[in-house]
Swiss-Prot record:
GO BP, sorted A to Z: fatty acid beta-oxidation
Protein name as catalogued: Fatty acid oxidation complex subunit alpha
Pfam families noted in UniProt: 3HCDH, 3HCDH_N, ECH_1
Organism: Escherichia coli O6:K15:H31 (strain 536 / UPEC)
Region: 3-hydroxyacyl-CoA dehydrogenase, residue numbers: 311-729
UniProtKB keywords: Fatty acid metabolism, Isomerase, Lipid degradation, Lipid metabolism, Lyase, Multifunctional enzyme, NAD, Oxidoreductase
CDD domains: crotonase-like (cd06558)
Residue numbers binding NAD(+): M324, D343, V400, V401, E402, K407, S429, N453
Region annotation (Enoyl-CoA hydratase/isomerase) ranges: 1-189
Site (Important for catalytic activity): E119, E139
Ranges for region Disordered: 707-729
One Gene Ontology term, aspect cellular component: fatty acid beta-oxidation multienzyme complex
Length: 729
């Protein structure tokens, strides 16, 4: 053996050909700082081999390299700019030395080669892949850009347009697309990968393939005329501005860096990449987006641990068809769990089946499935007016009208029709689970399962643990939600659970602003354009349904009378009484008309101003800062209360529930990440300016204690000490 590190080794294969094998402990290879340093040492050994003729890179895992070790990022991003820049120079010197070896090199790439894994193989002369390949540079999704030469090598290999599409969007592509655009040189079956790579290497060694000519473009300026460059980069910048917007600086920075580096050779181009990467790594956006990635891993890991001893349900049932029931049935069937869909009338069943068929037809139109697959999935949804087949189901979710009496009656009747070990769940959005459990003989087999609309798009499912819900019940429902491709987060029971409990104080802040004379149009604009919500509160209420919000508001007020009870008529009351229910009947804060694609498009409606004038003070202007503060403080305070009361277990789960359930702007990272970025002391100062507005603006005691020492909610992160000889950079 020529070299052995903790995560890779180097050995001779045959006749002057060496293999460098990535083989980290555990299930996957990551390109962490230690592996980069180890790679440098291995290349140092290769540089001393006078009889070296060629090099094969491969992996001993099911995936080549899944990317950099993102768990290192937050601490790496705290390293001072100069030191981080030095380390990146060192890392790039390693990849340059790989690229500059005086022999042909090939990467045999199986499975994933993402981020640093992709950048590593870009430094080799040839790339041969297996059909399961996913290769790309997702860094911009984490608020950064490629830092190991990806923004330099990829455009010079693929051309500017293809590279910009991958880098700016943070995309990865499959084997066929990678071959088409020149990211890999061939695709072979997994069992032929090493054999095929060796054949290419021998051809290069024998002179049948000109490996030096293959390498040369990566070392030179980008081959684009001034007109071509102007077109490519202008179009790319326009697309990025439209899709990413001002809150996500990484994509536009990446495009501008590639543009600036286009006229330079490798060394100067890499220097420009370094100068762009380092400031991005120190942005709040990068910390927030990396935090979301890590929180997502944490939440999924927690679900996996929770379900390790239970069997995933093999047969499910939905009570109540319609749009929501049809959406749940589709999602379950689509992911391989057959479902019985029951309702008391044919019309609702037809609506539910139509919804499922519509979603499947969209998959067909996009080429994701063929007619055979569509027929196969739809055949696993069984509509019924009775309880036929319910003796075989493992889990039932009730999705009938949001009325406790109706829900209790339906659940109690269903309990008599299923096996004693069948789990029942309610898709209620606000009614306490422990209250509904009172109607059941086996409350330990019951919990909440709150889906978000539209079911097929929204990743979150809130799993609500009632007072008597057993651990096994929770685990089975979490397993089903995970099987459906959802992100389940377990919360404890209370009115509104977690997501709706924190949403309604936000709506209350909106109502108070309107009462004090604010214009809902400006509030929507500020909360969308400045804070970054996908919809402002008025638009969101129209989408949720003014009638739904009016009902839920009453439930929340009964549950938390001290904070959420109001003693005045507000905008929601005014619109509800005027039969303006939002998008569902075309009239809410806005008027809605269908566009050419049949989607509701909002328009101004002056009638609303007259309605709101009856429940508001005369119109006056509010600053953007005041609007954001008055909207966000009630929500954030309630989020903190939920953590303090144990409704939600951790800041990570709270933030993921907000991002996945409400669309909390990802570049803020969630309420707790936003709080930590702001600082608890600064937040307290801001909130105290508004505490005269009522109990929703009063900061919880636990947060006051944290603010005294400006303590964060997430565990403090220490700056990293990257492995690598900075002096050689």
């Amino acid at each position: 053996m020529l070299y052995k590190g903790d995560t890779l080794y180097l050995d001779w294969l045959e006749d002057g050909i060496a293999e460098l094998v990535f083989d980290a402990p555990g299930s996957v290879n990551k390109l962490d700082t230690a592996t980069v340093a180890s790679l440098g040492e291995a290349i140092g050994v290769l540089e001393q081999q006078s009889d070296l003729k060629g090099l094969l890179l491969r992996s001993n895992k099911a995936a080549f390299i899944v990317g950099a070790d993102i768990t290192e990022f937050l601490s790496l991003f705290l390293v001072p700019e100069e030191q981080l820049s030095q380390w990146l120079h060192f890392a790039n010197s390693v990849f340059n030395r790989l690229e500059d070896l005086p022999v042909p090199t090939i990467a045999a790439v199986n499975g994933y080669a993402l981020g640093g894994g992709c950048e590593c193989v870009l430094a080799t002369d040839y790339r041969l892949a297996t059909p399961d390949l996913r290769i790309g540079l997702p860094e911009t999704k984490l608020g950064i850009m490629p830092g190991f030469g990806g923004s330099v090598r990829m455009p010079r290999m693929l051309g500017a347009d293809s590279a910009l599409e991958i880098i700016a969007a943070g995309k990865d592509v499959g084997a066929d697309q990678a071959l088409k655009i020149g990211l890999v040189d061939g695709v072979v079956k997994a069992e032929k990968l090493v054999e095929g790579a060796m054949a290419i290497l021998r051809q290069a060694i024998n002179g049948d393939l000109d490996w030096k000519a293959k390498r040369q473009p990566k070392l030179e300026p980008l081959k684009l005329s001034k007109i071509e460059a102007a077109m490519s980069f202008t179009i790319a910048k326009g697309m990025v501005a439209q899709t990413a917007g001002k809150h996500y600086p990484a994509p536009i920075t990446a495009v501008k860096t590639i543009e600036a580096a286009a006229r330079f050779g490798r060394e100067e181009a890499l220097n420009l990449e370094n100068k762009s990467f380092v400031p991005l790594a120190h942005t709040n956006e990068a910390r927030a987006l990396v935090g979301i990635f890590l929180n997502d891993q944490y939440v999924k890991g927690k679900a996996k641990k929770l379900t390790k001893d239970v069997e995933t349900p093999k047969q499910a049932a939905v009570l109540g068809a319609g749009i929501m029931g049809g959406g749940i049935a589709y999602q379950s069937a689509w992911k391989g769990v057959p479902v019985v869909m029951k309702d008391i009338n044919d019309k609702s069943l037809t609506l539910g089946m139509t919804e499922a068929a519509k979603l499947l037809n969209k998959q067909l139109e996009r080429g994701k499935i063929d007619g055979l697959k569509l027929a196969g999935v739809i055949s696993t949804i069984h509509p019924t007016l009775d309880y036929a087949g319910f003796d075989r189901v493992d889990v039932v979710v009730e999705a009938v009208v949001e009325n406790p009496k109706v829900k209790k009656a339906v659940l109690a009747e269903t309990e008599q029709k299923v096996r004693p070990d069948t789990v029942l769940a309610s898709n209620t959005s606000t009614i306490p689970i422990s209250e509904l459990a009172n109607a059941l003989e086996r409350p330990e087999n019951f919990c909440g399962m709150h889906f978000f609309n539209p079911v097929h798009r929204m990743p979150l499912v809130e799993i609500i643990r009632g007072e008597k819900s057993s651990d096994e019940t929770i685990a089975k429902v979490v397993a089903w939600a995970s099987k459906m491709g959802k992100t389940p987060i377990v919360v404890n029971d209370c009115p509104g659970f977690f997501v709706n409990r924190v949403l309604f104080p936000y709506f209350a802040g909106f109502s108070q602003l309107l009462r004090d004379g604010a214009d809902f149009r400006k509030i929507d604009k500020v909360m969308e354009k400045q804070f970054g919500w996908p919809m402002g509160p008025a638009y969101l209420l129209d989408v949720v349904g003014i009638d739904t919000a009016h009902h839920a508001q009453a439930v929340m007020a009964a549950g938390f009378p001290q904070r959420m009870q109001k003693d005045y008529r507000d905008a929601i009351d005014a619109l509800f009484n005027a039969n303006r229910f939002g998008q569902k009947n075309g009239l809410g804060f806005w008027r809605y008309k269908e566009d050419s694609k049949g989607k509701p498009k909002k328009e101004e409606d002056v009638v609303v101003d007259d309605l709101l004038a009856k429940v508001s003070q005369p119109k006056r202007d509010f600053s953007e800062e005041e609007i954001i503060a008055r909207m966000m403080i009630p929500m954030v305070n309630e989020v903190v209360r939920c953590l303090e009361e144990g409704i939600i277990a951790t800041p990570a789960e709270a933030d993921m529930a907000l991002v996945y359930g409400l669309g909390f702007p990802p570049f803020h990272g969630g309420a707790f990440r936003w709080l930590d970025t702001l600082g608890s002391a600064k937040y307290l100062d801001m909130a105290q300016q508004y505490q005269h507005l009522g109990p929703l603006y009063e900061v919880p005691e636990g947060m006051r204690n944290k603010a005294r020492h400006n303590e964060p909610y997430y565990p403090p992160v220490e700056p990293a000490r990257p492995v690598g000889d900075l002096k050689t950079a």
